[in-house]
Amino acid sequence: MASVSPLAKFKLVFLGDQSVGKTSIITRFMYDKFDTTYQPTIGIDFLSKTMYLEDRTVRLQLWDTAGQERFRSLIPSYIRDSSVAIVVYDVSNRQTFLNTSKWIEDVHRERGQSNVIIVLVGNKTDLVEKRQVSISEGEDKGKEYGVMFIETSAKENFNIKALFRKIAAALPGVDSYSLATKSDDMVDVNLKTTSNSSQGEQQGGAGGGGGCSC
Protein backbone atom coordinates (compact mmCIF):
# COMPACT_ATOMS: atom_id res chain seq x y z
CA MET A 1 0.00 0.00 0.00
CA ALA A 2 1.34 3.42 -0.95
CA SER A 3 2.27 5.66 1.94
CA VAL A 4 0.17 8.77 2.53
CA SER A 5 2.13 12.02 2.64
CA PRO A 6 1.49 14.04 5.79
CA LEU A 7 -0.66 17.13 5.35
CA ALA A 8 1.52 20.24 5.48
CA LYS A 9 0.17 22.74 7.99
CA PHE A 10 0.95 26.45 8.09
CA LYS A 11 -0.10 28.74 10.91
CA LEU A 12 -1.08 32.27 9.84
CA VAL A 13 -1.53 34.79 12.64
CA PHE A 14 -3.31 38.10 11.96
CA LEU A 15 -2.00 41.05 13.98
CA GLY A 16 -2.90 44.72 14.24
CA ASP A 17 -4.86 47.28 16.21
CA GLN A 18 -8.54 47.00 16.97
CA SER A 19 -10.96 47.74 14.08
CA VAL A 20 -8.40 47.56 11.25
CA GLY A 21 -10.35 44.72 9.60
CA LYS A 22 -8.45 41.53 10.45
CA THR A 23 -11.65 39.55 10.96
CA SER A 24 -13.22 41.03 7.83
CA ILE A 25 -10.26 39.96 5.67
CA ILE A 26 -10.53 36.41 7.03
CA THR A 27 -14.31 36.34 6.59
CA ARG A 28 -14.05 37.59 3.00
CA PHE A 29 -11.44 34.96 2.20
CA MET A 30 -13.24 32.08 3.93
CA TYR A 31 -16.86 32.81 3.03
CA ASP A 32 -16.72 35.61 0.42
CA LYS A 33 -18.87 37.73 2.73
CA PHE A 34 -18.59 41.14 4.38
CA ASP A 35 -20.37 41.80 7.66
CA THR A 36 -21.37 45.44 8.14
CA THR A 37 -22.03 44.84 11.83
CA TYR A 38 -18.75 45.25 13.67
CA GLN A 39 -18.08 42.87 16.54
CA PRO A 40 -14.59 43.03 18.06
CA THR A 41 -12.66 39.80 18.40
CA ILE A 42 -12.46 38.63 22.01
CA GLY A 43 -9.16 36.92 22.72
CA ILE A 44 -8.21 34.63 19.83
CA ASP A 45 -10.38 33.09 17.09
CA PHE A 46 -9.31 30.14 14.94
CA LEU A 47 -10.35 28.95 11.48
CA SER A 48 -8.83 26.27 9.29
CA LYS A 49 -8.83 25.76 5.53
CA THR A 50 -7.62 22.77 3.53
CA MET A 51 -6.31 23.72 0.10
CA TYR A 52 -5.13 21.83 -2.92
CA LEU A 53 -2.04 23.05 -4.72
CA GLU A 54 -0.89 21.51 -7.97
CA ASP A 55 1.84 19.53 -6.21
CA ARG A 56 0.38 18.92 -2.74
CA THR A 57 -2.36 19.65 -0.23
CA VAL A 58 -1.87 22.10 2.63
CA ARG A 59 -3.87 23.22 5.60
CA LEU A 60 -3.88 26.90 6.50
CA GLN A 61 -4.63 27.64 10.14
CA LEU A 62 -5.88 31.23 10.43
CA TRP A 63 -5.53 32.77 13.88
CA ASP A 64 -7.45 36.03 14.37
CA THR A 65 -6.12 38.01 17.32
CA ALA A 66 -7.83 40.76 19.30
CA GLY A 67 -6.40 44.24 18.85
CA GLN A 68 -7.39 45.54 22.28
CA GLU A 69 -4.55 46.27 24.67
CA ARG A 70 -5.99 44.00 27.38
CA PHE A 71 -5.44 40.96 25.15
CA ARG A 72 -1.88 41.81 24.10
CA SER A 73 -0.35 39.44 26.66
CA LEU A 74 -1.98 36.48 24.88
CA ILE A 75 -0.51 37.20 21.47
CA PRO A 76 3.22 36.33 21.81
CA SER A 77 2.47 32.65 22.40
CA TYR A 78 0.53 32.53 19.11
CA ILE A 79 3.29 34.31 17.21
CA ARG A 80 5.94 31.94 18.53
CA ASP A 81 5.12 28.94 16.32
CA SER A 82 3.58 30.78 13.36
CA SER A 83 4.65 30.35 9.75
CA VAL A 84 3.19 33.67 8.58
CA ALA A 85 2.37 36.94 10.36
CA ILE A 86 -0.11 39.26 8.62
CA VAL A 87 0.17 42.75 10.14
CA VAL A 88 -2.90 44.82 9.23
CA TYR A 89 -3.52 48.57 9.47
CA ASP A 90 -6.36 50.86 8.41
CA VAL A 91 -5.33 53.26 5.62
CA SER A 92 -7.85 55.79 6.99
CA ASN A 93 -6.30 55.74 10.47
CA ARG A 94 -2.68 56.85 10.55
CA GLN A 95 -2.06 55.74 14.12
CA THR A 96 -2.80 52.11 13.21
CA PHE A 97 -0.12 52.40 10.51
CA LEU A 98 2.42 53.85 12.94
CA ASN A 99 1.65 51.03 15.36
CA THR A 100 2.56 48.37 12.79
CA SER A 101 6.21 48.95 13.69
CA LYS A 102 5.49 47.59 17.16
CA TRP A 103 3.60 44.60 15.76
CA ILE A 104 6.41 43.73 13.36
CA GLU A 105 8.98 44.11 16.13
CA ASP A 106 6.88 41.76 18.29
CA VAL A 107 7.11 39.15 15.54
CA HIS A 108 10.86 39.62 15.20
CA ARG A 109 11.30 39.28 18.95
CA GLU A 110 9.30 36.04 19.13
CA ARG A 111 10.36 34.44 15.84
CA GLY A 112 13.56 36.14 14.73
CA GLN A 113 13.92 37.96 11.43
CA SER A 114 14.44 35.01 9.09
CA ASN A 115 12.14 32.26 10.36
CA VAL A 116 8.75 33.74 9.55
CA ILE A 117 7.00 35.31 6.57
CA ILE A 118 5.61 38.78 7.36
CA VAL A 119 3.06 40.60 5.22
CA LEU A 120 2.13 44.24 5.87
CA VAL A 121 -1.47 44.87 4.79
CA GLY A 122 -3.10 48.28 4.36
CA ASN A 123 -6.84 47.58 4.58
CA LYS A 124 -9.97 49.69 3.86
CA THR A 125 -8.81 51.16 0.54
CA ASP A 126 -12.48 51.81 -0.27
CA LEU A 127 -12.38 54.77 2.15
CA VAL A 128 -10.76 56.92 -0.52
CA GLU A 129 -11.76 60.31 0.88
CA LYS A 130 -10.60 59.36 4.38
CA ARG A 131 -7.20 57.94 3.42
CA GLN A 132 -4.41 59.06 5.75
CA VAL A 133 -1.66 56.68 4.63
CA SER A 134 -0.38 56.66 1.05
CA ILE A 135 0.55 53.54 -0.89
CA SER A 136 4.15 54.73 -1.08
CA GLU A 137 4.33 55.00 2.72
CA GLY A 138 3.19 51.41 3.03
CA GLU A 139 5.71 50.30 0.42
CA ASP A 140 8.50 52.20 2.19
CA LYS A 141 7.71 50.59 5.53
CA GLY A 142 7.67 47.18 3.88
CA LYS A 143 11.12 47.85 2.47
CA GLU A 144 12.34 49.23 5.80
CA TYR A 145 11.46 46.02 7.60
CA GLY A 146 12.11 43.67 4.69
CA VAL A 147 8.52 42.40 4.58
CA MET A 148 5.94 41.99 1.83
CA PHE A 149 3.31 44.71 1.34
CA ILE A 150 -0.15 44.84 -0.19
CA GLU A 151 -3.29 46.98 0.13
CA THR A 152 -6.76 45.45 0.42
CA SER A 153 -10.42 46.20 0.95
CA ALA A 154 -12.43 43.45 2.57
CA LYS A 155 -15.59 45.47 1.89
CA GLU A 156 -14.97 45.75 -1.87
CA ASN A 157 -13.19 42.36 -2.12
CA PHE A 158 -10.10 44.13 -3.44
CA ASN A 159 -6.83 42.18 -3.41
CA ILE A 160 -8.05 39.58 -0.89
CA LYS A 161 -7.21 36.68 -3.19
CA ALA A 162 -4.01 38.44 -4.21
CA LEU A 163 -2.99 38.60 -0.54
CA PHE A 164 -3.33 34.85 -0.13
CA ARG A 165 -1.64 34.19 -3.48
CA LYS A 166 1.29 36.22 -2.15
CA ILE A 167 1.36 34.16 1.02
CA ALA A 168 0.98 30.84 -0.81
CA ALA A 169 3.84 31.66 -3.16
CA ALA A 170 6.12 32.40 -0.20
CA LEU A 171 5.38 29.24 1.81
CA PRO A 172 8.28 26.77 2.06
CA GLY A 173 8.27 24.25 -0.76
CA VAL A 174 5.40 25.87 -2.65
CA ASP A 175 6.23 26.36 -6.32
CA SER A 176 2.71 26.94 -7.59
CA TYR A 177 -0.25 28.68 -6.03
CA SER A 178 -3.30 27.51 -7.93
CA LEU A 179 -5.52 26.62 -4.99
CA ALA A 180 -8.96 25.14 -4.48
CA THR A 181 -10.82 24.09 -1.37
CA LYS A 182 -12.59 20.82 -0.67
CA SER A 183 -16.29 21.08 -1.39
CA ASP A 184 -17.10 20.02 2.16
CA ASP A 185 -14.65 22.42 3.79
CA MET A 186 -16.70 25.57 4.38
CA VAL A 187 -16.43 27.31 1.00
CA ASP A 188 -14.84 26.81 -2.39
CA VAL A 189 -11.77 28.96 -2.88
CA ASN A 190 -9.95 29.24 -6.18
CA LEU A 191 -6.96 31.54 -6.11
CA LYS A 192 -6.03 31.07 -9.75
CA THR A 193 -6.04 34.49 -11.39
CA THR A 194 -8.67 34.98 -14.10
CA SER A 195 -9.25 38.00 -16.29
CA ASN A 196 -12.61 38.69 -14.66
CA SER A 197 -11.37 38.43 -11.10
CA SER A 198 -8.33 40.54 -11.90
CA GLN A 199 -10.50 43.28 -13.35
CA GLY A 200 -12.77 43.11 -10.33
CA GLU A 201 -9.86 43.50 -7.96
CA GLN A 202 -8.41 46.38 -9.95
CA GLN A 203 -11.74 48.18 -9.94
CA GLY A 204 -12.47 47.43 -6.28
CA GLY A 205 -9.93 49.88 -4.89
CA ALA A 206 -11.23 52.73 -7.01
CA GLY A 207 -14.73 52.61 -5.60
CA GLY A 208 -15.34 55.22 -2.93
CA GLY A 209 -17.16 54.32 0.22
CA GLY A 210 -18.33 56.04 3.32
CA GLY A 211 -19.08 54.84 6.79
CA CYS A 212 -17.42 51.98 8.56
CA SER A 213 -15.44 49.60 6.41
CA CYS A 214 -13.41 46.65 7.59
Swiss-Prot record:
As one GO molecular function, the record gives:
GTPase activity
Q: Pfam families of this UniProt entry?
A: Ras (PF00071)
Q: Which GO terms describe its cellular component?
A: cytosol; Golgi membrane; plasma membrane
Task: List the InterPro entries hit by this protein, alphabetically.
Answer: P-loop_NTPase, Rab, Small_GTP-bd, Small_GTPase
Segments carrying motif Effector region: 38-46
In terms of CDD domains, this protein maps to:
Rab6
Q: What is the residue range of the signal peptide feature?
A: none
Single Gene Ontology BP annotation: vesicle-mediated transport
Lipid-conjugated positions (S-geranylgeranyl cysteine): C212, C214
Cysteine methyl ester is carried by which residues?
Answer: C214
Annotated Gene3D superfamilies: P-loop containing nucleotide triphosphate hydrolases
Spell out the residue ranges making up region: Disordered.
194-214
Chief place of localization: Golgi
Q: Which UniProt keywords apply?
A: Cytoplasm, ER-Golgi transport, Golgi apparatus, GTP-binding, Lipoprotein, Membrane, Methylation, Nucleotide-binding, Prenylation, Protein transport, Transport
Q: Where in the cell is it found?
A: Golgi apparatus membrane; Cytoplasm, Cytosol
For the ligand (GTP), the binding residues are: 16-23, 64-68, 123-126, 153-154
Q: What is the effect of changing Q68L?
A: No effect on targeting to Golgi
Query: Where does this protein have compositionally biased stretches of type Gly residues?
Result: 202-214
Q: How does it sit in the bilayer?
A: Lipid-anchor
Q: What does this protein do?
A: Protein transport. Regulator of membrane traffic from the Golgi apparatus towards the endoplasmic reticulum (ER).
Q: How does it assemble?
A: Interacts with the C-terminus of GC5, but not with GC3.
The similarity comment for this entry is:
Belongs to the small GTPase superfamily. Rab family.
The protein's name is: Ras-related protein RABH1c
